[in-house]
Design a protein with these regions (language model features):
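Alpha-helical interface subdomain recognition
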Residues: 1-331
Length: 331
């Protein structure tokens, strides 16, 4: 949570400098490569923020149902926290890597001034690196993410086989969702089916030995992280009331959707190449072709930067209601 908050704060610091600094007789904020950096900062911060709110809110909601006078109250709290270990690890990895990206690109925007202690970026650049190491390195947290999903799937706490049976011939289930949100829903559900199938393939091939296959655990964890971002961010966007804030959020969500759709495909490809599953590679290609999905990520970034420049700071801290649930790969 603190790393995400730090990223939002540093966006404003880098933005203030970019507006003031001139090069070649114009503000560096007008250069497209600088705009690209800011669009990515905003999007990554919003994704991390969404995961944080979902995770902490779900834990808080579950704890609120416990009887504080019960002798087993604290044991119950511990059980709830353990039940959210996957979400917590995702939040830790995502938050620390979001801050790392924002600090690094913030220094790049500021140039040599980024190392001067008069600016907040210098201290952040010096201190940020530890976030990917303590509280469990991000590598250990990725092992937790993949390992816990594996464990829950084998114990059928996540009903992998049932869900796959329901999606054998149709990776995108029918829905009465509004037409304007149909494409978003379809992409999220495609990625859910993709993640379910990759999980199943790994369980069938390795079983519990998967925990020793770190070449696979890392891309598998990244696949799970990407799907968690897609699922949570769609629910956050969908829960918003119609209006100006939802329109601005939608512009960021479009970029999130495209980025993690392609990242999911890439991680799945890496896994399937390694385990030599050409049939699943072909199946993914067939199902993907049904989407006819043609995102325009540069246009999305241009829209995000326009909103950011108008606000002159991170501008997406508005919630209408909770969108709480476990991050799991089944409905």
């Amino acid at each position: 949570v603190t790393t995400c908050a730090g990223a939002k704060y540093l966006i404003e610091g880098a933005l203030d400098f970019a507006f003031e600094r001139e090069q070649f007789s114009r503000s560096i904020s007008n250069f497209d490569m600088v705009k690209n950096k800011f669009a990515n900062m905003v999007t990554k911060s919003w994704e991390s923020d969404s995961i944080n709110y979902m995770t902490t809110g779900a834990i808080d909601q579950a704890i609120s149902k416990l009887d504080k006078n019960d002798d087993n109250f604290y044991a119950g709290v511990q059980k709830i926290i353990e039940d959210h270990s996957i979400e917590s690890s995702i939040a830790k990895v995502l938050g620390s890597e979001t801050l790392a990206y924002t600090v690094d690109e913030g220094v790049q925007v500021m140039g040599g001034a980024g190392f001067i202690e008069d600016y907040p970026m210098a201290g952040a650049y010096r201190d940020e690196r530890i976030n990917r190491i303590f509280e469990g390195t991000n590598e250990i947290n990725r092992m937790i993410i993949g390992g816990y999903v594996l464990k829950k799937s084998i114990l059928e706490e996540i009903p992998i086989r049932l869900c796959i049976q329901e999606r054998v011939d149709n990776w995108i289930p029918d829905s009465d969702i509004e037409l304007e949100n149909k494409e978003y829903f379809n992409i999220v559900e495609f990625c859910r089916s993709l993640t379910l199938n990759i999980t199943n393939k790994l369980i069938l091939k390795y079983g519990q030995d998967l925990k020793n296959e770190q070449w696979l655990l890392e891309p598998f964890a990244d696949l799970l992280i990407s799907f968690s971002i897609l699922d949570t961010c769609f629910k956050r966007f969908y829960s918003l009331n119609e209006g100006d804030h939802k329109s601005k959020t939608e512009r960021v969500f479009k970029l999130t959707l495209a980025n993690h759709y392609f990242n999911s495909l890439e991680k799945a490809q890496i896994i399937l190449e390694y385990i030599n599953d050409d049939d699943m590679i072909e199946k993914i290609s067939i199902e993907k072709s049904k989407l006819n999905y043609k995102p325009n990520r540069i246009k999305y970034k241009q829209d995000i930067v326009n909103d950011l420049y108008n606000h002159k700071k991170y501008y997406l801290d508005i919630f209408t209601r909770y969108f709480l649930n476990h991050i799991i790969i089944v409905n």
